[in-house]
Amino acid sequence: MKTLFVTYHYLHGNGGGVFASRGFVNAFAKLSERLTLLCPVKDDVAPEGIAPSARVIPVSYEKPRWRKYIDLLLGKIHRFYGVFDQVLASEHFDLVVFDTCYVSFRLIQKVRRRGCQVVTIHHNFQCEYVRDNYRFPVRFPLLFWTRICEREAVQNSDLNLTLTEADRQSLAKAYDSAGKACIRVIGVFEYRNDAGAHIYPLSEEPVFIVTGDLSMRQTVEPFLEWMHEYLPILREVVPGAKVIVAGKDPAQSFIRACETDGIEVVESPTDMASVLRRGRYYLCPSSKGSGIKLRVMDGLKNGMPVLAHEMSARGYEPFVGHEVRCYNTPDSFRKAMKEMLTVPFDVETIISHYQDTFSYEAGIARLQGILESTILEK
């Protein structure tokens, strides 16, 4: 099949959305006779980690911030309107994949009129994500258009793919009361087949590692709340425990708050693996946002037991109760912490389970199975 793939994410760097989108692009490229990729670029930074078989068409959007805000108010929520029409008319595509509902907005009906099948990948229940991450003046117009484009995508796609079961249920409840939409869970996976995990010795000391984008509200605010409510419990249960938090672009106020409580902050590390190898346990306290918290994969990939807020455990159900322990209250945190410290674990076993679930090959197999049982069956 010939596939046109349109993504909302800049395909360079190490963000969670970037990681997931690379995997989807490469998996669809693997399963397609030919894949054309429309992707955003800025500052002429080329996409990274994309299958060489993909035909890449980069699209820039160099406008001042005030003009972008006017575009948002008018409902111009992506950059692909003109170029998409040209590419769609240039050849016959069997399948068009929209990577987020945003890039499908006002394009999906054009695709359907051409007789192409449509897949939309939902990285989050987008309305919930907007509520948790954006403030005035962007929040309200973005939320308004998000509701419209998310509904349009769910109701007009031949197949909707989500990263978690929770998001599948949220989308169905919000936009599919009639039960007509096809919504399946694909999860996430590595974007290349040589991304095998490496076994390194973990710290023998009780060192807890937290990673994430420290410029995002859904990372910073829950962590500050965790420091206030849960850090005293951690230090009570594990005297001498050390907490290290690493991520890009932390605010100075965040760094000061951490240092006051004796938490080490590693700013914008160039090698996250070296930070992870300093720890023994992985901690994910994020309690906001939808989608899947890809940073939990950092811990599992390195063979570390994970302690996560139940919101952060979405998408990791096969690991819950074993490699991943969950909490949502101080009492459940204390219980999960004690279990994690007393139950023996094997680094190689955790890594093997990670590979079985999140390897590139596992992702391709999941995608192929979903396509064959849905749109390719038609």
Describe every region a protein language model picked out:
Residues 26, 185-257, 261, 265-273, ...:
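Conserved catalytic-core segment of nucleotide-activated headgroup transferases in glycan assembly
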Residues 85, 126, 140-160:
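Membrane-proximal helix-turn-helix segments that form the acceptor-binding/catalytic region
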